[in-house]
Amino acid sequence: MAAADPFLHLARPLGPVAVGSAPTTAPLNVVIQPQALFSILDHSLRRNADQERVIGTLLGTRSEDGTEVEIRSTFAVGHTETTDQVEVDMEYQKQMLALHLKANPKEVLVGWYATSSELNTFSALIQNFYSGQGDGTFPHPAVHLTVSTEPGKDIETRAYISAPVGVTAERAADSAAFIPVPHEIRYGETEKSGLEAIAAARDAEERAANLFTDIEALERAIEEVLGMIDRVSRYVESVIDEEAPASTALGQFLLNALALAPKVEPADIERDFNNHIQDVLVVSYLANTIRTQMELSNRLATAQLTLGGESGSTESGQRGGQRGGKGGRGGQQRNQERSGEEVRA
């Protein structure tokens, strides 16, 4: 990464600028987000078998003074490259850039990437296109990010900017001096957790990783911290016993880490932890009580509806029976009257 790069980077104005305009300063640092790097690696895996490298566009943000560039997202750009010429689908690049800028108005064009560490004449042509006026990054220099994706080797990333080279305009169009700039891959706690979950499936046969619950994740984190503390303790003991060479940088780092620890007594920590556990238990008890009351009220309401339906059907049956009895008595009276009339006759 940037700390291991064997060069000294000095910020300076780059390229010819218009009269009366402020000079543009080269970026002092390039920050790469993990999602952008994963997108580049995915593009490399999906390339054709006859392609040595693939290229694409880098999108991100730039600080107000231009000293730091953050690469947040990328998209692939089709190109055909031979030993004699290179063809890049510029129209597709312009349309995709317009769509990305509409979806993410805070991002801007910052440069381009290639999945090869080689810098040649074709790289200079593409670099001049991305750093040109109009659809390029002008007046800011375009960042060229190279990512080596050779199988069986570690992934190496390098960042460059360019300066114009050539006496004539025709010669300068296909020439550029690439200047390396410091860069780093920066990720937060969320990205780190995701990367650790993905890395856990590296040695598994099914190539899948199980996601842990919050309690399991907390337990694993505590175990990792305890392991780090044991390793640091063994190192300090070995330095004290003169079994290992002392490191001033490591000692300063450990001193700064210990200075961040809060000055709290163990008894206070235990008391606060117990109070927190009691609060959690109270909340859990109240939640279970509310759940039980809701279930009980639902059951009572269902029982009332069931009993009300049964009593209504019974009453309607009794009323129907009473109406039937009345109808029977009326029929008997009519029969008796008819028999009396026949006797009189």
From Swiss-Prot:
Bias type Gly residues, positions: 318-331
Basic and acidic residues bias spans: 335-345
GO cellular component: eukaryotic 43S preinitiation complex; eukaryotic 48S preinitiation complex; eukaryotic translation initiation factor 3 complex, eIF3e; eukaryotic translation initiation factor 3 complex, eIF3m
GO biological process: formation of cytoplasmic translation initiation complex
Protein's UniProt keywords contain Protein biosynthesis: yes
Primary residence: cytoplasm
Region described as Disordered: spans on this chain: 308-345
Alphabetical list of InterPro entries matching this protein: eIF3f (IPR027531), EIF3F/CSN6-like_C (IPR024969), JAMM/MPN+_dom (IPR000555), MPN (IPR037518)
One matching Pfam family: MitMem_reg
The MPN domain, residue ranges: 30-166
Keyword Cell membrane applies: no
Subcellular location, record wording: Cytoplasm
Function: Component of the eukaryotic translation initiation factor 3 (eIF-3) complex, which is involved in protein synthesis of a specialized repertoire of mRNAs and, together with other initiation factors, stimulates binding of mRNA and methionyl-tRNAi to the 40S ribosome. The eIF-3 complex specifically targets and initiates translation of a subset of mRNAs involved in cell proliferation.
PANTHER family linked: EUKARYOTIC TRANSLATION INITIATION FACTOR 3 SUBUNIT F, EUKARYOTIC TRANSLATION INITIATION FACTOR 3 SUBUNIT F-RELATED
Subunit structure: Component of the eukaryotic translation initiation factor 3 (eIF-3) complex.
Protein known as: Eukaryotic translation initiation factor 3 subunit F
Species whose genome carries this gene: Aspergillus terreus (strain NIH 2624 / FGSC A1156)
